A protein has these predicted regions:
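Alpha-helical membrane-inserting segments
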Residues: 54, 61, 139, 143, ...
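Interfacial segments of alpha-helical transmembrane regions
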Residues: 110-142
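N-terminal transmembrane-helix/juxtamembrane module of multi-pass inner/ER membrane proteins
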Residues: 11, 26-100, 144-149, 156-163
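Short hydrophobic targeting helices and cationic amphipathic motifs
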Residues: 5, 22-24
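Hydrophobic, aromatic-rich transmembrane alpha-helices
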Residues: 97-110, 187-196
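Membrane-interfacial segments
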Residues: 108-113, 146-151, 155, 201, ...
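Membrane-embedded catalytic cores of phosphoryl/pyrophosphoryl-handling enzymes
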Residues: 37-47, 163-277
Length: 277
């Protein structure tokens, strides 16, 4: 557990201080400080919740899962749970395919694509592909194969055959693939997409993406497919990976080319630069 906490600490330090050696103007520093305030709060809150869930994994997981269990997981066949389980990943795959299709058409028939879709360029596609295949697909399945954690309905506590294990504890359940949640991680690609769409609709898009992710995460718990820690760490780890990639590819580059020091920065220029962040 000490090793895991050290990893969270290193991630926090990197996310906060990776631009420390850049020479920034006063205007840029001010913008950076305003940008970092919510990031600092998020990292502090996420670290605190993570430590709590790691230390109290058994109590939190069994209590919440027990609320939806009564001689079986009675919401397992619920229409909402079944729809999220069956169609959620297909819908995201279709959306990813649509974005790839738009990018391909732009390369061939530029005049046919609306200017509103100009944000789908080579750099954006690279970011979305890294997020889709790396953080949202390879990462969760790597965790599943390594930890082999039993799903709630597979544990002996809930009429299964495998032993319950805490989060980040390697299990030996042959069919165990609970940690971390694949559906939840996959849904986090919507967050990656929301980060690169035009600024004017970015905030509502991020809000919608987070809402969809939380809805899918809730359905995984209600159906007895995952524990609370499975979906929480799926969101946290996948989200950190996506944000670190976005920060490296977009924010760090913008900060590396700020307005020159000593050059008067107009209100319009400041707003344009802030929009890039």
């Amino acid at each position: 557990m000490v090793f895991i906490l050290k990893i969270f600490r290193l991630i926090s330090v990197w996310l906060l201080n990776s631009e420390e050696n850049l020479f920034l103007s006063d205007a840029t520093l001010s913008l950076r400080e305003n940008t970092m305030k919510p990031t600092t709060f998020f990292i502090t809150a996420a670290t605190a919740v993570s430590i709590l869930l790691i230390c109290c994994s058994e109590q939190c997981d069994l209590f919440l899962t027990g609320l939806v269990y009564q001689n079986g997981f009675y919401l397992h066949e619920n229409l909402f749970v079944d729809a999220a389980d069956t169609y959620g990943e297909y819908a995201i795959c279709a959306l990813f395919a649509a974005v790839c299709g738009i990018f391909a058409l732009k390369q061939k028939f530029r005049t046919l694509i609306s200017n509103k879709l100009n944000f789908i360029n080579a750099k954006t596609m690279l970011f979305l592909c890294i997020s889709f295949f790396g953080w949202c697909t390879a990462l969760p399945y790597g965790f599943k194969i390594f930890f082999r954690r039993a799903r709630p309905y597979q544990t002996d506590i809930f009429a299964g055959d495998c032993t319950f294990t805490n989060a980040f504890v390697k299990s030996f359940c042959p069919a165990g693939d609970s940690f971390i949640s694949g559906h939840t991680s996959f849904a986090m690609w919507l967050f990656a997409l929301a980060l690169v769409i035009p600024q004017r609709i970015r905030t509502p898009s991020i809000t919608a993406a987070v809402g969809i992710v939380l809805t899918i995460a809730a359905s995984r718990i209600l159906g007895g497919y995952h524990f609370l820690t499975d979906v929480y760490f799926a969101i946290l780890l996948t989200g950190c990976g996506i944000w670190a990639t976005y920060k490296t590819m977009f924010i760090a580059e913008n900060c590396a080319n700020p307005p020159e020091t000593g050059t008067p920065v107009s209100h319009t220029t400041t707003r344009l630069y802030e929009n890039k962040l």
